[in-house]
Amino acid sequence: MARMLLGDVNVDRIEVASARVSEGEKDAVRMICRYAESVGKLDRVEVLGFVDGHKSIDWIDECGCRVLNLLAKGSLKHCTHQLKKTPEEHIDDIYRSLAYAAQKNMLVNLYLEDWSSGMKDSPDYVFQMMDALVESGIKRFLLPDTLGILNPIQVLEYLGKMKERYPSTHFDFHAHNDYDLAVGNSLAAVKAGVSGLHVTVNGLGERCGNAPLASVQAILRDQLHVDTGIREDRLGEISRLVEGYSGIAIAPNQPIVGENVFTQVAGVHADGDNKDNLYCNDLVPERFGRKREYALGKNSGKANIARNLEELGLELTPEQTRRVTQRITELGDRKEMVTQDDLPFIVSDVLKYS
């Protein structure tokens, strides 16, 4: 998957693991880093680490990874309740981690975990952290909506404040989908001026997941005219690969990658496609390595049937087409599934008794 994401799909960066999880995870990260180094892409592989003295940094260094995504606290409550430290103590700990990472020749990005709650409840703490760290050599500040609590209006407001106060700083936005707003919030983040977005294949992630790669890519290209360099024709393939390895099925109606999203059911839509593509938008299936299909059922109509017959190389008279359509409608009324593979047998049966 790492090879395909970095090579075929051409994402900018991949965060592949959390430090100190297991020996199996460590072996996997080593393999990914060896591959990435062999193709000159080691700087695009990142590992999540913690403010835990030297432990995470040593673990990541032993894997051969050169980019640390350091997890710090982005809300006062997280700092004082979870770490049981003052902001000043936490900042000192971060600086010690930065110094040790520099000794290991490691690039550091910084997560401000629970940043969204921090901006709502303790913005002075967020700005205290940023003021202390903005000139520290951290390459990117990663701003997560950890609990998925923001809406696009709030994203514009809070990120606008960050960009206004720190205009030359590279910010990434990391959305969670608890309110089904991860994609919308990611769009708002780009409008607010962030430089990077965190997405996952199929939207997989904690709880309700994160913003899905395919959906965000389509919006960036079509709505904001942003060229990300992503190979859209490989998105369907990586989606199926992740579905298989994760065991988490893709919803049939999930935009871009779902099984049914390029299937026309209503006959009037198929008829419109035959007449100057009246029911098509910019999300054409070929763009994503897919093809349009026309469902067979009681709502199909003659246009859908004709499309499927044409794909199979079958030619029927108007009367024969009418009878085939009638038979498919009858099967649909009985809730029976009709596929294109069934169509030759239905045609044969109709012709036999006509």
What are these regions (language model features)?
Residues R20-G40, V45-L48, D52-I57:
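N-terminal active-site wall of soluble small-molecule enzyme domains
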Residues I14-S18, R44-V47, L142, D172-H174:
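Short catalytic-loop micro-motif centered on adjacent basic/acidic residues
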Residues M1-R13, R34-G40, G53-N109, E113-T169, ...:
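Alpha/beta enzyme core
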Residues H225-S354:
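A mid-to-C-terminal "edge-of-domain" accessory segment
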Residues L147-L150, E157-K275, Y279-N281:
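Catalytic alpha/beta core domains of metabolic enzymes, predominantly
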Residues M1, G24-A28, S56, E89-D93, ...:
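General structural feature for long, well-ordered alpha-helical segments within catalytic domains
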Residues S18-A19, F50-D52, A72-S75, E113-W115, ...:
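Short, ordered loop/turn segments at secondary-structure junctions
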